[in-house]
Regions:
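C-terminal motif of bacterial Sec signal peptides marking the signal peptidase cleavage site
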Residues: 14-17
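Bacterial signal peptide processing site
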Residues: 19-21
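A generic structural signal for short, non-catalytic loop/turn and secondary-structure boundary residues
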Residues: 6, 56-58, 89-91, 127, ...
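Sec-dependent signal peptide recognition
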Residues: 2-8
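N-terminal module-boundary/linker segments of secreted carbohydrate-active enzymes
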Residues: 23-95, 101, 106, 110-113
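Intrinsically disordered, low-complexity sequence elements enriched in Ser/Thr/Gly/Pro
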Residues: 1, 24-27, 195
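Substrate-binding cleft of extracellular glycoside hydrolase catalytic domains
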Residues: 103-219
Length: 220
């Protein structure tokens, strides 16, 4: 199975010494250095910068995002530069979210035009300086149902059973995801860092990876 170069690395942010000479005795306050650790020692410089910047701005506020913002809106579809957020707020969102599921599971060849559009929008978002985040509402690799097919509690177990049909299917899907990650580049030619958030809402019961279908050990 190919290695997915999605985000996470190690960075050191230096502490900041603060002093106030205007009132009373000189006071000096130093913050301890913070070590940020990513799981991938080969993370790209863009990935490192993304993680560092997200850490640095957390005390200043939050970032507004909109799913598929550049791909379609209330009255348009696929218009380059389109954004309902921009139409309402005057600017593009800081975070662009999208779903890669249809690129990797058994729907991967079903709508090449929509897939090409989604990848184009990802590149456009990166070029605009947005933070990219991807979820994957992939189909059920055991039953062939959709993400919400929670009819079996054996899906995760079969995925984790080396050599099973479900295990092989799931690895094939991950290989397709790896291909995207290795080839998704901005206009600067650099790989685009993506915050990958699979299997979200896993404590709920409505998906095949949810609490009604998996054990804590299987999920971890």
């Amino acid at each position: 199975m190919k290695r997915i170069p999605f985000v996470l690395l190690a960075l050191l942010l230096s502490g900041v010494a603060c002093s106030d000479d205007s009132e009373g005795p000189k006071k000096e306050r130093e913050s301890d250095p913070v070590t940020l650790t990513l799981s991938d020692p080969n993370a790209t410089e863009e990935t490192k910068a993304l993680y560092s910047n997200l850490w640095a701005i957390q005390s200043k506020g939050f970032m507004f995002g909109h799913h598929d913002d550049l791909m379609y809106g209330r009255t348009w579809y696929g218009t380059e530069g389109g954004s309902d957020t921009k139409a309402v707020c005057g600017d593009y969102p800081a975070v662009y979210s999208f779903d890669f599921a249809e690129h990797i599971d058994d729907r991967h060849a079903s709508d090449p035009d929509a897939q090409a559009l989604r990848l184009r929008c990802c590149r456009e978002a990166y070029d605009r300086g947005m933070v990219l985040a991807s979820c994957i509402h992939i189909n059920n690799p055991l039953t062939g149902g959709d993400s919400w097919d929670n009819s079996s509690n054996r899906v995760a177990a079969e995925i984790l059973t080396e050599g099973s049909a479900t295990n092989r299917t799931f690895k094939e899907w991950l290989d397709r995801l790896a291909d995207i990650a290795h080839n998704l580049r901005g206009s600067d030619g650099k790989l685009i860092p993506v915050i990958f958030r699979p299997f979200h809402e896993h404590t709920q019961t409505w998906s095949w990876w949810g609490a009604s279908c998996t054990t804590t050990e299987e999920f971890v």
